[in-house]
Amino acid sequence: MQQTLSIIKPDAVEKGVIGKIIDRFESAGLRIAAAKKIKLSKCDASQFYAIHKERSFFNDLVDYMTSGPVVVMVLEGENAVAKNRELMGATDPKKAAPGTIRADFAESIDANAVHGSDSEENAKNEIAFFFAGREIC
């Protein structure tokens, strides 16, 4: 079984659509192996998104991700990385296919409701960032 990391971002948490988003994952055959609601510190967000450190949007991204609570989850299933990315839709909700999470729940390319690992290797690193092995079952 493949695992991937999903983050329900502050805009979606604030809108109260956590359950609706989780339902999308479960309806698509992804199982929640671990989940927790947390408030990221600036340090945590900066470390997690370090790959974007030199990009112009980095500071805005860190500010956004620390603006409210997030829900981090380990999703598990066949082709979990690809399946999650398909469910999320395009990064820009205006370009996301109808029926995807971002098309239905996101407001902008910045406040785009969810994060999902983009590869199996990144999924392993991202999961390890948020979860100890004993937290995943």
Swiss-Prot record:
Its EC number is 2.7.4.6. GO terms for molecular function: ATP binding; metal ion binding; nucleoside diphosphate kinase activity. InterPro entries: NDK-like_dom, NDK-like_dom_sf, Nucleoside_diP_kinase, Nucleoside_diP_kinase_AS. Its main location: cytoplasm. Pfam families: NDK. The active site is at H115 (pros-phosphohistidine intermediate). SMART domains: NDK. One of its GO terms (biological process) is CTP biosynthetic process. Keywords: ATP-binding, Cytoplasm, Kinase, Magnesium, Metal-binding, Nucleotide metabolism, Nucleotide-binding, Phosphoprotein, Transferase. SUPFAM superfamilies: Nucleoside diphosphate kinase, NDK. It is found in: Cytoplasm. It is an enzyme of class 2 (transferase). ATP binds at K9, F57, R85, T91, R102, N112. It comes from the Bacteria. It catalyses: a 2'-deoxyribonucleoside 5'-diphosphate + ATP = a 2'-deoxyribonucleoside 5'-triphosphate + ADP; a ribonucleoside 5'-diphosphate + ATP = a ribonucleoside 5'-triphosphate + ADP. Its cofactor is Mg(2+). GO terms for cellular component: cytoplasm. NCBIfam families: PRK00668.1. Belongs to the NDK family. Homotetramer. Major role in the synthesis of nucleoside triphosphates other than ATP. The ATP gamma phosphate is transferred to the NDP beta phosphate via a ping-pong mechanism, using a phosphorylated active-site intermediate. This is Nucleoside diphosphate kinase.
